[in-house]
Amino acid sequence: MPARFPNISSRAWEHPADRAALESLRKVPGFDLVVRKVMGLLSERPLKLITLGSAVEVGPDQYPRLNALYEEVLQTLDAPERYPLFVTQNPVMNAGAVGMDHPFIVLNSGTVLQLDDAQVRSVLGHEVGHILSDHVLYKTMLRFLLKGGQLLTRMPLAGLPLLAVVAAMLEWDRKSELSADRASLLACQDPDVVRGALLRMAGGVGDGANITAFREQARRYEEGGSALDSVIKTLALLNRSHPFPVQRMGELDRWIESGAYEEILSGHYPLRDEDPDESTWDYWRESVGSYAEGVKQSTDPVAKWMRQAGTGVKDKASGAWDWIRGRSPDETPPADEDELPPGPEVGPDGVIDL
């Protein structure tokens, strides 16, 4: 069984872009109103009842091997409780964490059939990571907004403001996957297991699939091309809930190379009992700073151009913060700036969330 991490905080695996994007999402005009409206329309009970009626719940007497893997993941990440786990009939290799106050996890049958035990463990770690990072509420809301169809037209926010909120939620949603991939690695503690799962998700099935070649493909995707290619890559992601598998592999490799993964394995990690108030400016500033440092190390053409042109991502982020607060960049911040608050497939029947 992998090493356990008692009292580990989700901050240990959260990608700085995830935290920064979530903070930015909360600043989008109309976001609070969208949350209130969707919460008024959504109910956790129907989601749970439909899943209970249409899928198979995992337990000691049902999928006992899968249940044992799941219990190990919960212990490894020191989850405070067991979240119900279901397997639903769907050949697509995928999984998802669903719900609000009482989340649960759904594995597609294709995931159980196509992955080995270690890879299934990594998928379970990914989903538990989403829950422990408090991603599930917003993810459930986003799937509802994307699938709401005509129901959304009855909402007073329908139109451009709502589109802006959905676009911001999609951007955060993609970044949240990078955090969950790190939790996935902590759950299985073998980088090649997570890489293998990403390879299979991208189409690498059968004995001929090669992790080393796929990592080289990821490197070529990230480094190759011009700044225009980077724009094309960005546009290609706009309507996707997940980054491309090669991007996820590259991000995971960078985290490993940074030494942060080994640091956690050695027992040095932030503790849940010491989690800061996420509403503080210091917390957001730390996320922006970490994200900016990642861009400095990036081989992406746009990031290279920004460095060569002397454009600092951190400065841009600070400028955005000033704009959010309605303050001119030239104004001197108040003495108590740091104390200011930051201010202003969901369901088992489809491809959900790996």
Task: List each language-model region with its residue ranges.
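Low-complexity, charge- and small-residue-enriched intrinsically disordered regions
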Residues: S54, L157-S179, G312-K314, S318-D338
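Cytosolic-facing loops and C-terminal tails of multi-pass membrane proteins
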Residues: M1-K48, L186, G196-L354
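Residues in soluble alpha-helical coiled-coils and helical-bundle/repeat scaffolds
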Residues: S133-V136, C188-Q189, R240
